[in-house]
């Protein structure tokens, strides 16, 4: 059975939002669709959600929708004529909180505290770090700078202040509006941007609970402060994203690979799914094939233990969105087929019953050469627990809950499947065998593992394990 354990997250944008393109992305291997709330209107996102849901039903493939909030991103303002301007090394350049149309000498920002937050000698980076400024002085609403590294500056580009701990809210008013919208439209995950401390995650969770939902929160790690508070954030979040774009601007590029491995290792320790993101196949925005370095980057993220890898501009605005997904799927499959062994999760000091059952069934799957592991779950807890121990065989997650099946689309090694509510533990083997034979996922004589919890339907009660031979007594 051809199977890919690691999942693919695709950002939906102008290049990929049509029904035809959504269908092609699903066929190529998309598991999770990311909606970037830094761009587009609520009308755009509502249309994309409807298109995604319709395509998922048509192809009978559960797909998770990840709503990615903009966060307290500081950006430059508009430019005269909406045209890029060229900044040259050595010239003076002003960033002002006044409302002005920018040009080659100045640009506005809506971040009003900026003049209070920076001082002489501080570095300011624009446009994902491509342009570097040094603060000369602050005069009223103006921050007067010298251009150290020049370049072309477009409208609404990011402003980064390395080494400066900004006093900004974890969620802006726009984020709160977008969060309510995303929850109303059934987003399966919420990504909180620029998380710096666990309180940022807890705030997002509080707002989710107030809306009467239990939607998981993914913490995007893109600030050095987040790395300082990594374990506390992992304890609060439901998953994390290694957002290497802003992370690579806020810290020296040579540190990013080490930090990436640290985040993934700690996330595995805390049993949190981790998405590795940003510029993975960046050249495929313009070219039909990636560079060899990009292919290695994707493979190494898999070797590190990522649950999922993400495409951003490659699928949102690139020329080859379908080819990028197909290429990423092939790289993952090749990496997973190699002799390189995925790192096992670092065990906690004391295993609980659920963890012990999950670890044992994964160990048995190797010893008994199982075809797959069948998991019966309402909330997805059992499937996530088994996934933590990285079995070599697929995890078929049977659930009567549509929201659970969609969320499982992000989790490593899990193939979500619908099944009616099962009340009795005795019939699990017969139910699993019938369904698996119908889908031709097993053959007579195959050994499978069955994991569930009793009483059935109660979260966190993973305490049942059975080995079953297809065609044998149930």
Explain the meaning of each model-derived region:
Residues 1-474:
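Non-catalytic helical/linker scaffolds that mediate oligomerization, partner binding
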């Amino acid at each position: 059975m051809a199977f890919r354990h690691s999942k693919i997250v695709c950002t939906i944008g102008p290049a990929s939002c049509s029904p035809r393109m959504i269908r092609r992305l699903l066929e190529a291997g998309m598991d999770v669709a990311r909606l970037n709330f830094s761009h587009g209107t609520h009308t755009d996102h509502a249309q994309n959600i409807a298109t995604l849901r319709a395509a998922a039903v048509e192809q009978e493939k559960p797909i998770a929708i990840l709503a990615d909030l903009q966060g307290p991103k500081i950006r430059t303002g508009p430019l005269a004529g909406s045209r890029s301007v060229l900044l040259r090394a050595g010239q003076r350049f002003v960033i002002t909180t006044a409302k002005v149309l920018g040009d080659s000498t100045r640009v506005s920002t809506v971040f009003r505290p900026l003049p209070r937050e920076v001082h002489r000698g501080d570095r300011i980076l624009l446009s994902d770090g491509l342009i570097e400024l040094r603060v000369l002085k602050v005069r009223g609403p103006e921050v007067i700078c010298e251009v150290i590294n020049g370049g072309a500056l477009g409208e609404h580009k990011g402003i980064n202040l390395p080494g400066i701990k900004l006093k900004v809210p974890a969620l802006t008013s726009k984020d709160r509006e977008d969060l309510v919208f995303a929850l109303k439209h059934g987003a399966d995950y919420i990504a909180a941007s620029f998380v710096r401390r666990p309180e940022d995650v807890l705030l997002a969770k509080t707002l989710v609970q107030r809306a009467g939902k239990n939607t998981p929160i993914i913490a995007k790690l893109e600030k050095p402060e987040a790395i300082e508070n990594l374990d506390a954030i992992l304890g609060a979040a439901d998953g994390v994203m290694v957002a290497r774009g802003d992370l690579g601007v806020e810290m020296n590029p040579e540190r990013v690979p080490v930090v990436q491995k640290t985040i993934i290792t700690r996330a595995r320790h805390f049993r949190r799914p981790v998405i590795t993101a940003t510029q993975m196949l960046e050249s495929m925005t313009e070219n039909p094939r990636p560079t060899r370095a990009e292919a290695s980057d994707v493979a190494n993220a898999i070797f590190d233990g990522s649950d999922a890898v993400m495409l951003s501009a490659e699928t949102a605005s690139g020329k080859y969105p379908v080819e990028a997904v197909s290429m990423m799927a092939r790289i993952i499959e090749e990496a997973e087929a190699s002799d390189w062994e995925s790192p096992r999760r670092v065990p906690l000091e004391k295993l609980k019953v659920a963890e012990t059952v999950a670890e044992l069934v994964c160990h048995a799957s190797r010893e008994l050469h199982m075809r797959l592991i069948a998991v019966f779950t309402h909330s997805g807890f059992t499937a996530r627990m088994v996934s933590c121990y990285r079995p070599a065989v697929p995890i078929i997650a049977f659930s009567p809950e549509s929201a659970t099946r969609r969320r499982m689309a992000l989790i490593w090694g899990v193939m979500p499947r619908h099944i009616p509510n099962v009340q009795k533990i005795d019939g699990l083997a017969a139910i699993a065998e019938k369904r698996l034979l119908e889908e031709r996922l097993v053959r007579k004589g195959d050994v499978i593992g069955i994991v569930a919890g009793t009483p059935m339907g109660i979260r966190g009660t993973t305490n049942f394990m059975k080995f079953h031979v297809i065609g044998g007594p149930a």
